[in-house]
């Protein structure tokens, strides 16, 4: 678990537990939300069908979500990523791939790349997630078709009686179930669109927010990050932009970044992560210093189409889970903190970021500091699943980071943004989910959450599929199951 705040003993115990059934800890990423519950590992579909019929359960992938959406106390946890549902089959006629519930993003990308020369339309950059878990919680990249679930053309799940139910794009319930954040589960197979592997022109820049539109010209995809303790009127940004590339261009080695600041600036940016991690109170003066340096740097490369996370990393070769080189020391801070994210209309993103900068800076006297950066990934166009971030308009994902003990401050910042921007939509694996999101998810005049619950009731009349406390609050479906503390205290 990247950046986990577990003790060595807890880490070792969790490592030993992998692949075993019985009492196990289910933890959110960074271990803010957790519970101990009964775990089962389905080795095949028949075993999963039997388990579904035995009693109340929830489904867990790689447990990469930060907000505890995968943590459901008092029920059997189906550990799908550790199971044996490993279907992987490519159909050259339709250029689609069939994927089982135990397949990781890495396994799928390697399968498509090697011998087939294909890739996903888009993805996040964490390779160990289960594909189905990533899609179910709205995982996204940036640029065209950014939300992974938008590439689903068919899905199969088991209902409350263990029977197969298959939905295809265009079926009445499909658009609700394709991205349903654990309320329709277990999804045992997906069929996804793919595309040919291709290089991109990748430009990484360090500049100012006022230059964003100019720097993005000609880009098909843009991911930018703001240093929150630089000038609040015109903060320092790092931009990663992708543009289409002539197919005949060969991938190039990394050039030296160009721009002002000299060797000291280069060294400082490279080692920023270490300062940020061990001296959190020093974050603001460090960023003020960077602001004073007024760095302007850029690099341009052609990406290697064989790179597993080609939408993120411009360095040729199999490099993963990392940012473009001139900003790597800054983005590395995101691997050791709590991450909360939500979506706002793309044209509102600069104003939202400036608002967060001001609100966060006002909390310094209470000991709160944002960690490293505010990340913004742009999702142009619209997506098919009704709960996709950009289901109705282009959106931008706002990612905030803080030390794990400060996660509640991030939830406060989210709520403040929602006061002023009613179209704020949730990231189902990172947002502080709650009733406040109902209006935005139903803003087209239809009660999509009610429709989702109708689908749930129809296929799970037994009520054996359970979902997390925060999802229940957002759906307004009653109190959550009692955890040990509530039960022992007599509160539930």
Residue ranges and their predicted role:
Residues 67-87, 141-162, 186-193:
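Structural signature of FAD isoalloxazine-binding scaffolds in flavoprotein oxidoreductases
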Residues 61, 222-227, 322, 339-340, ...:
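A short glycine-rich, hydrophobically flanked beta-strand micro-motif that places a catalytic Asp/Glu
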Residues 27-122, 134, 138-142:
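Glycine-rich N-terminal segment of FAD-binding domains in flavoprotein oxidoreductases
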Residues 326-328, 408-492:
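Activity-critical C-terminal alpha-helical subdomain
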Residues 136, 153-351, 355-358, 370:
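C-terminal substrate-binding/cap subdomain adjacent to the FAD-binding core in PCMH-type
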Residues 116-125, 163-167, 199-200, 221-223, ...:
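Short secondary-structure capping/junction motifs at helix and strand boundaries
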Residues 1-27, 485-492:
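Intrinsically disordered, low-structural-confidence terminal and linker regions
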Residues 345, 353-400:
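C-terminal structural cap/anchor segments
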């Amino acid at each position: 678990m990247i950046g986990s705040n577990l003790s060595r003993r807890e880490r070792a115990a969790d490592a030993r537990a992998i692949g075993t059934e019985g009492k196990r800890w289910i933890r959110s990423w960074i271990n803010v939300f957790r519970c101990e519950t009964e775990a089962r590992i389905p080795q095949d579909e028949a075993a999963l069908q039997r388990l579904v019929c035995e009693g109340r359960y929830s489904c867990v992938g790689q447990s990469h979500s930060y907000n505890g959406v995968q943590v459901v106390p008092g029920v059997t946890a189906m550990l799908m990523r550790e199971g044996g549902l490993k279907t992987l089959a490519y159909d050259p006629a339709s250029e689609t791939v069939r994927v089982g519930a135990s397949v990781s993003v890495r396994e799928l990308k390697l399968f498509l790349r090697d011998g087939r020369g294909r890739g996903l339309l888009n993805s996040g950059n964490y390779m160990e997630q289960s594909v189905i878990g990533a899609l179910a919680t709205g995982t996204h990249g940036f640029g065209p078709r950014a939300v992974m679930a938008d590439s689903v053309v068919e899905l199969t799940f088991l209902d409350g009686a263990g029977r197969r139910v298959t939905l295809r794009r265009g079926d009445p319930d499909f658009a609700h179930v394709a991205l349903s954040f654990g309320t329709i589960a277990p999804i045992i197979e997906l069929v996804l669109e793919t595309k040919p592997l291709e290089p991109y022109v990748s430009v990484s820049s360090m500049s100012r927010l006022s230059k964003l539109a100019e720097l993005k010209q000609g880009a098909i995809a843009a991911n930018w990050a703001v240093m929150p303790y630089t000038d609040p009127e015109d903060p320092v940004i790092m931009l990663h932009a992708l543009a289409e590339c002539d197919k005949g261009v060969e991938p190039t080695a990394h050039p030296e970044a160009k721009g002002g600041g000299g060797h000291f600036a280069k060294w400082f940016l490279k080692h920023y992560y270490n300062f940020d991690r061990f001296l959190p109170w020093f974050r603001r003066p460090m960023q003020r210093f960077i602001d004073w340096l007024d760095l302007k740097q850029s690099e341009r490369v052609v990406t290697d189409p064989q790179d597993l996370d080609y939408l993120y990393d411009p360095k040729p070769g199999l490099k993963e889970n990392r940012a473009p080189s001139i900003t790597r020391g800054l983005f590395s801070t995101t691997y050791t903190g709590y991450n909360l994210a939500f979506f706002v209309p793309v044209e509102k993103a600069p104003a939202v970021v400036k608002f967060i900068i001001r609100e966060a800076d006002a909390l310094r006297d209470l000991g709160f500091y944002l960690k490293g950066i505010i990340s913004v990934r742009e999702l142009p166009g619209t997506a098919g699943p009704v709960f996709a971030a950009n289901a109705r308009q282009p959106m931008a994902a706002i990612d905030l980071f803080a030390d794990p003990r400060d996660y509640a401050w991030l939830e406060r910042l989210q709520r403040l943004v929602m006061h002023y921007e009613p179209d704020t939509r949730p990231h189902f694996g990172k947002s502080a989910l709650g009733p406040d999101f109902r209006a935005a998810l139903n803003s087209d005049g239809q009660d999509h959450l009610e429709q989702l619950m109708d689908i749930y009731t129809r296929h799970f009349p037994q009520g054996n599929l359970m979902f997390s406390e925060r999802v229940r609050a957002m759906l307004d479906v009653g109190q959550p199951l009692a955890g040990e503390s509530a039960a022992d205290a007599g509160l539930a």
